[in-house]
Amino acid sequence: MRCFALVMSLVAGATAASAQSFSVPVVYRKLPNGLRVVVSENHAAPVVVVEVMYRIGFRIEPRNRTGFAHLFEHLMFQGSEHVAKFEHVRIVNENGGVLNGSTRFDHTNYFEVMPSNALELAIWLEADRMRSLKITPENLKNQQDVVSEEVRVNVLNQPYGAFEWLGLPQKANTNWYNAHNFYGDLSDLQAATLDDVKQFFETYYAPNNAVLVVTGDATVDEVMKLAEKNFGSIPQRQLPARPD
């Protein structure tokens, strides 16, 4: 019994030490314009991850705007006021980084993994497209076609490929937001006007509808100064009620 108690105490101590060694420091802040900032410092390597998450995904799209969340995942790489078309990708790659974006049920996210000495560059790139995305007739038409083709190839033309996105939600739910076609009705997508798309951007791509997350080799003070400098002047907007 004494041996068993000793073993159990050692296991408990090891477990506690292990849990302590894996604790992750996280700091939450918010700018006056509503942008939430989450920072987790880890100085093990000179690398940072910068991510901006917007509260708009497949499930939150309003009626007659299905497919818009996914459309914007593509439009966000078409240039902004100070960054030409496709330059966002080139700039990140030439500074030793990688990037991507994705659309989920309740959010769309964009991220860069960069050397930590390029932290300000990554934050500036994200702020520039939140502030001044280039929504032009050419960019819209091009990405309408790209997204439509992606849906056809990856979903509609795949055996059972449509089930998760087009079939299951309607069978599992009655609320329209949870039951509609999550990849979007292609007729909604192709009917989108420039004004429709601009209004969607102005509604959902707002600082008070977003979270800036920075993890890695950066301090909280450094991140907050850069967040205020680059995002602080972007005005917050009136947000629609969130669906059930």
Language model region names:
Residues 57-62, 132, 220-221:
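Short beta-strands and strand-coil junctions in structured, solvent-facing domains, enriched
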Residues 16-21:
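Boundary at the C-terminal end of the N-terminal hydrophobic targeting segment
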Residues 4-14:
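Bacterial N-terminal signal peptides
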Residues 34, 43-92:
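Active/ligand-binding-proximal structured segments within catalytic/core domains
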Residues 25-27, 33-35, 46-52, 106-108, ...:
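Envelope-exposed proteins and targeting segments
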Residues 174, 207, 211-244:
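An aromatic/glycine/proline-enriched structural segment found at the starts
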Residues 54, 80-81, 87-200, 229, ...:
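Acidic/histidine-enriched segments that form metal/cofactor-coordinating
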Residues 26-28, 36-41, 198-203:
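Short, surface-exposed beta-strand/loop micro-motifs that present aromatic residues
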